[in-house]
Amino acid sequence: MKERLLRRYAGTPTRRYVSAAAGPFPLLSLLLLLPMACFSQRLTPLSNAPDWDQLNRFQETMTREAFVDLLGSVYAPNGAGAQWIKVEATRALIQENASDQFVLQFASSAESSKTVPRYWTAAANLAANNDLPLSGVKIAIDPGHLGGTWAKMEERWFQIGDSIPVTEGDMTLRVAQLLVPRLQSLGAKVTLVRSSPGPVTTVRPDELNTQAEASLRESGIKNILPSYAGPDDPNREDSIPWEAQRLFYRVGEIHTRAQIINEKIKPDLVLCLHFDAEPWGTSTNPVLVSVNHLHLLINGAYSTGELGFDDERFAMLWKLLDQTYPEELACSEYVAQSMARITGLPPYRYSSPNAKSVGWSGYVWARNLLANRLYECPVIFIEAYVMNSQEFFARFQAGEYEGFRNFGGVMRQNIFEEYVQGTVEGIAAYFRATRGKR
């Protein structure tokens, strides 16, 4: 489902200390330093201050031309990063925070570029294998959102009368479960990031009240509410409990999944599974719409406001320098073509400035989401179907039937099998076409 704009707030500033060497007026020195300390770092909710020294691994791994091209065409279009990134002839000067700079040295030529150190392997670096195109490939499957009782908190479910509830987190988990043996049969080593309906983080909303209040204040909410009256309360977004819940499932949960992916699984590819939706009103009296569509997302299209946060700027540079873009785009295009052919869905088109069309099919868009930002490897982020479309609702209610059934004059497989088939065929086709082509 398309992510709402996140509220953000400034993180805890870096502590600075004044020694006796500060002079005869230590208190005055402290007061002079205080403004710099208070505003030296700006972080998104629940984020740690980035360790900029980690970017030293990318010194001289990319030419100036390649850096400028990716920055302007994919990651920070329309000069979004100009305030913090100054490109010179042989280096880029990057603001770490309000007071410190990181210096990135460019490679003098593509031939002299140093090898990019990363935990994932590009498909082109694998030996050709048409029989088992995913042999030696580590794939992490990230079923989007939460299921079970958590779905109501996340507002990712709806029900019409006595029908089967439509719950995105349960549906993505079911698709993931079906994907595992299919990908394994093609040689892949597959790991589920989430294998049950509940969260992978151990933090719960009631532990995030302090951060929630800070987030609301940073967003300019003056009348912060201590509680709200339920999902239909029009003022719920101004309350601490609602904001704490949002930070729990939208931010903390994704940070934990990122730790699992980057520190434990270390895959070559992540599949983020989602079902899209249009506004449906209330969960107990939803509006079904006639539109149904498909699109895929890769990381990019950062705004000036987003790059004003130190951790987002750091993560953007990591993705750019890690050179995930070519892999993400090419693989996403293969999956998009496969899913479009099997589902018959048209491409979704963004009209907002927070997304940029990339590639050639019309199905793939660059967008800055927390998951595709924090996962330090190629991410294929699928938004298939519109959950509250009339067509999808009818097919979902039919369940996991065998074979084909007639829907609106078209013989269709069950919705889960269709999702799985489109994904598997696209990934297999990409690796068959790309392996051994370095």
Which functions belong to the PLM regions below?
Residues 5, 39-438:
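Catalytic-site microenvironment of enzymes
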Residues 23, 31-32:
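Hydrophobic alpha-helical transmembrane segments of integral membrane proteins
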Residues 2-8, 12-16:
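Short polybasic linear motifs
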